[in-house]
C-alpha cells in the first residue's frame, strides 16, 4: 500500500459467471520485480547482520522466505533475533503460523526445548524451500504427486479457454 497507493486488481473471467474482481493490497504486486527488488535491498543488511551474529548458522533468503539452518538452540536464538531486527528496524511482524521447522533427526520436543516458538509447525518428514521439497523420499514423492495433481487441474481450466492467446 505504501509503495503503490492503491490495491491491485486481480481479475477472473469464467464462462457462465462472467468477470470477477478481487482487490489485493498485501505484499508486492505479482510480477512487480521493482517492489521485490527494493524489498530484497532493504532486508539484505539485516540478514547479513544476522549471519554475522550467528556464524554457526546458515541464513538463506529469497525475497521474504528466510531460512535459518543450524543447531536447534542457535537457530531458535537466531529466529528470535531476526524477529527483533525485522520488527524494530522495519516495523515488520513475523507470523509464526507461516513458519516451519524441519528437523530430520531431532524430535519436536527436543527442538521446542531448544527455544523454538510454540506457534511454529515442526516436521520431521520435510518442508518446502524456495518452491521445492526438502526431506524424506516419501515427503518428496508426495510433494511431486501434489504438483502433478495441481497441474492436471490447471490443464482442465486452460482447456475451457476460448482462444489460444488467452491460454498463454
Labelled PLM ranges:
Residues 1-168:
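Nucleic-acid-interacting cores, centered on viral/eukaryotic replication and modification enzymes
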